A protein has these predicted regions:
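ABC-family P-loop ATPase nucleotide-binding domain
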Residues: 1-11, 300-306
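ABC transporter nucleotide-binding domain
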Residues: 169-261
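Hydrophobic/anchoring residues in structured secondary elements
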Residues: 37, 248-251, 285
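ABC transporter nucleotide-binding domains
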Residues: 3-5, 12-204, 210
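C-terminal coupling/interaction segments
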Residues: 261-306
Length: 306
């Protein structure tokens, strides 16, 4: 079976700005693959090249064996797209929007069944402007699925949703895959990527730095633990840089974050800091996760926006 997506040395430039820089990867049928990275990393531009919304400046792309830059009507019926920014007329009702989109396809999904599956059947007669953020997202997902796509693109699906709505949307993504579709998604949310994705790619400054399973990405850090703590006053980097078994030290004001080769080191680290004067509080020790992978590969936290 051919890959659902094949990307080879893809670039997209805007004058001197390189938004996507030599990206290559493949996605197999039935996979959920996530791309993580901060705003401005190039994730959305990359997806738009795969969706046929932007033309690459270089390289090649095949999506379901078709070049998205030269799409056919039949190809468009095989993909579903949930854009990062989307809108509907405020006075359109949910059922009206569903009927409108269904009319564009020869063999659409049953709109009532789709709304039921997504948990918004009770809102079919509601105006879009009256829906909550989570309900609107479900409507946009329903519209993206109304053509029974083989491949679904989800761009920042849960941005600005409350925790309950976010978890509900995770169930929606799982149901999409259970229905046989392939999913390529972007997200800022490390928990979301870990919970949903078979493989995760780290994107920064237009480049795909790595793409692998979450266990493999975390294992690449070599084990150990992440230690976070607060100090009563700022601590010079030099206090911690010389400690054996300590790496990736990040000091931001009175917050210290570092990696240790052992979970038994916190007291030694605390002692080293307090010998210089500051007191230590709020010590947290945890196993490495995707945030640590991102920090190690890019040298910055996911929360440090471009």
């Amino acid at each position: 079976m051919n890959p659902a997506i094949v990307v080879d040395d893809l670039t997209r430039t805007y004058g001197e700005l390189v938004a996507v820089d030599g990206v290559s990867f493949e996605v197999s049928p039935g996979e959920i693959v996530g791309l993580i990275g901060p705003n401005g990393a190039g994730k959305t531009t990359l997806l738009e090249c795969l969706e046929g919304l932007r033309t690459p400046s270089g390289g090649s792309v095949r999506v379901l064996d078709v070049d998205p830059a030269h799409p056919t009507p039949a190809w468009r019926t095989r993909i579903g797209v949930q854009l990062q920014t989307a809108a509907l007329p405020p006075k359109i009702k949910v059922r009206e929007a569903m009927s409108l989109f269904a009319s564009l396809y020869d063999h659409p999904a049953d709109t009532d069944e789709l709304l039921e599956e997504l948990g918004i059947a009770a809102k079919r007669d509601a105006y879009v402007e009256k829906l909550s953020g989570g309900q609107r997202q479900r409507v946009f997902i329903a519209l993206a699925l109304i053509n029974r796509p083989e491949l679904v693109f989800l761009d920042e699906l849960t941005t600005a949703l409350d925790p309950q709505a976010r978890l509900a949307m995770w169930d929606v993504v799982r149901s999409i895959r259970e229905g046989g579709a392939t999913v390529l998604m972007t997200t800022h949310d490390m928990d979301e990527a870990e919970a949903l994705c078979d493989r995760v790619g780290v994107v920064d400054h237009g480049r795909l730095i790595v793409l692998d399973t979450v266990p493999n990405l975390v294992a690449s850090l070599g084990g150990g633990a992440e230690i976070r703590l607060r100090t009563s006053s700022p601590v010079p980097d030099s206090v911690l840089d010389g400690l054996e078994g300590v790496s990736d030290v990040s000091v931001r004001g009175c917050r210290v974050r570092l990696r240790s080769t052992s979970t038994r080191f916190p007291q030694r680290i605390i002692d080293a800091i307090e010998r210089t004067g500051p007191t230590v509080s709020d010590v947290r020790v945890s196993a490495p996760d995707l945030e640590d992978v991102f920090l190690t590969l890019t040298g910055r936290s996911m929360r440090e926006e471009d």
